[in-house]
Amino acid sequence: MPEYIKRKFGDQTIVFETGKLAKFADGSVTVSYGETAVLVTAVSVTELKEDQDFLPLQVEYREKAAAAGRFPGGYFRKEGRPTDKEILTSRMIDRPLRPLFPKGYFYETQILGTLLSADGQNDPDVMAINGASAALMVSDIPFYGPVGAVRIGQIDGRWIINPTHREREISDIDLVYVGSEHYPLMIEGSAREFPEEEFVKALEFAHQHVQEVIAAQKELAEKVGKPKRSCVLFEENLAITNRLAELYSSQLQDALYTSSKTERQKKLAKLKEELTAKILEEFPTATPREITSSYDSLQKTIFRTNVLETKRRCDGRGPEDIRPIAIETSVVPRSHGSSLFCRGETQALCMATLASLNEAQELDAYGGGEQSKRFLLHYFFPPFSVGEVGRITGQSRREIGHGALAERSLLPVIPSETDFPYAIRVSSEILESNGSTSMATVCGGSLALMDAGVPLKTSVAGISVGLVKGKEEDFDWSRYCLLTDILGLEDHYGDMDFKIAGTRKGITGFQLDLKLRGIPLDVMAKAIFQSQKARMVILDCMDKVINAPRAEISKHAPRIEKIKIHPDKIGLLIGPGGKTIKKISAESGAEITIEDDGTVMIYSSSADSLEAAREMIEDMVGEVTVGGIYRSKVVSVKDFGCFIEIKGKGEGLVHISELSDTPVRRVDQVVRVGEEIWVKCIGVDEKGRYKFSRKAAMKELHAKRMQ
């Protein structure tokens, strides 16, 4: 029997419905908001795999073209590999749910979200998160939920709950907040240099407005929820852990507090071999899973105890210390802009590339939102960056997620298309990794863009703040320590990875990941202000190397020539099936874009190529404009000058004084009838006739060739 719960959520109503669709799943809920609807199912197996030592949670979100009344793109006209949007939404669903499964619950679990209907106004990602929580709540799968998700915006100082795509375009912040009844669990988003004080207010506002969604899920679970299943939870073998502590605590302490990551890993690997052999002598029936679990548990205990009691970290730093920073720019000769950003043992090589607007990425956004992107950032994490051998395939979900975080952190300072009509791409190659590579990408990306001459509004830097909590109890926050600029090991054994990027004025990008069942807002606020302090230090380091964009773009980057044609002539320039414009591009070697208002942009790194393309376009559809330069033919010579003809555009006069920089006594000594010359339109006389200058055209063309 279908059951549903309705709640007012922002300006609209959110509806949770279960018992109608996908009834064979352990839990199934359809969430509707406006005319956007997402079906989310949860299934968990009842058979535990032997030696399974982690929670194999798989979260997949998919958007169907039919939901928006469209055909899929591509040759086969069907949905294929997940898009970046689908992957990012899957990650947003996964991250707040993972800490809420019982400790030791290692049963294979799958959560699937499917977009059923898209109204093009409301982003389905928030509904998918709420649906996943609700599906687990009505199922028999053990789960310490529910959680509620909301998107928050701010327009003209006014908070907006679940802003539409159009509202998000003008909002000062785009915050996705996921929280429990008591604490935040996950946040993600971007902002336009948002002040830290206002950011904390946004979190408080969001926390208030997830409570209705949480209450709705509780009510639905009370109506139709199944009793939670009994299951076997993996428990650490305390006898082995205690014995390891007796025998190896001192050696583990020394190994963990080795400043070099490589040396630390070697010591820990050697120690594990030794202690495994020793434990098997004393505990012959111990499984590899039990030994590894106890070994990791002891490392974690030693690490956390040291941080809490001595405030000393593995590399000798204090809680708020930043690792040494080294920066270089212009490190790749043929790149349009590049930088090498090193923070401790984390190293990011970032390269910026400029191209025509034709290279902007077209998106199949079935759920609405932007349909194209002219600024792209791609993040690559090769296995050698951590000293490993691995498969080289397409980008992983993690790489896509890290790239998206860095991209939205830099986007608020990217110049508008009007001010800088280029498509822009930053690629980040992580060459060494020991924590916080996404924030290194933000710093390196900002430096590379400035090196490329992109007129950024200001520099952007990022830092990650970690956390070690004293007690496991959810509500006991009497003892904790926040760590600035965390290492990979601190991320692994710590409780939080809070990435925040921004400028000197405020925050531009953020992402919170927790291993706990939430964190108090006041602790989050301390982390936010701690990151602000660190960001200023990093920006100072960056500004010492490059504090403003280069005055000129790279000689290898395409230059731009801008022409205005009458909109009625756009079709003539494009030609049937794009034949004409493609021919001009092929013959000139330039890339050409055409806007609906008749603006034609010509891109080429060669001045000759630019001139050739401009000449061909002008010959075909151009109109004479003051300041324009044209190839013309001399049709008659007079004592006072010469008359020229511009193909398809009529005639005009070049006065004798405009023929050359040097005095001219006889016109026929400079030009002859039938000769082709370059002229610049310098005005219109009182009768509406164009006046041209040969010397002005030659001077301007010479200056362009010298660039």
UniProtKB/Swiss-Prot annotation:
GO biological process: mRNA catabolic process; RNA processing
SMART domains (alphabetical): KH, S1
Sequence similarity: Belongs to the polyribonucleotide nucleotidyltransferase family.
InterPro entries the record matches: ExoRNase_PH_dom1, ExoRNase_PH_dom2, ExoRNase_PH_dom2_sf, KH_dom, KH_dom_type_1, KH_dom_type_1_sf, NA-bd_OB-fold, PNPase
All copies of domain KH, residue ranges: 558-617
Span of domain S1 motif: 622-695
Protein name: Polyribonucleotide nucleotidyltransferase
GO molecular function: 3'-5'-RNA exonuclease activity; magnesium ion binding; polyribonucleotide nucleotidyltransferase activity; RNA binding
Pfam families according to UniProt: KH_1 (PF00013), PNPase (PF03726), RNase_PH (PF01138), RNase_PH_C (PF03725), S1 (PF00575)
PROSITE patterns in UniProt: KH_TYPE_1, S1
Function: Involved in mRNA degradation. Catalyzes the phosphorolysis of single-stranded polyribonucleotides processively in the 3'- to 5'-direction.
Locations listed in the record: Cytoplasm
NCBIfam families xref list: polynuc_phos, PRK11824.1
Binding residues annotated for Mg(2+), in chain numbering: D491, D497
E.C. number(s) listed in UniProt: 2.7.7.8
A single Gene Ontology CC term: cytosol
Gene responsible for this protein: pnp
Broad enzyme group: transferase
Known catalytic reactions: RNA(n+1) + phosphate = RNA(n) + a ribonucleoside 5'-diphosphate
Cofactor: Mg(2+)
Keywords in alphabetical order: Cytoplasm, Magnesium, Metal-binding, Nucleotidyltransferase, RNA-binding, Transferase
Domain of life: Bacteria
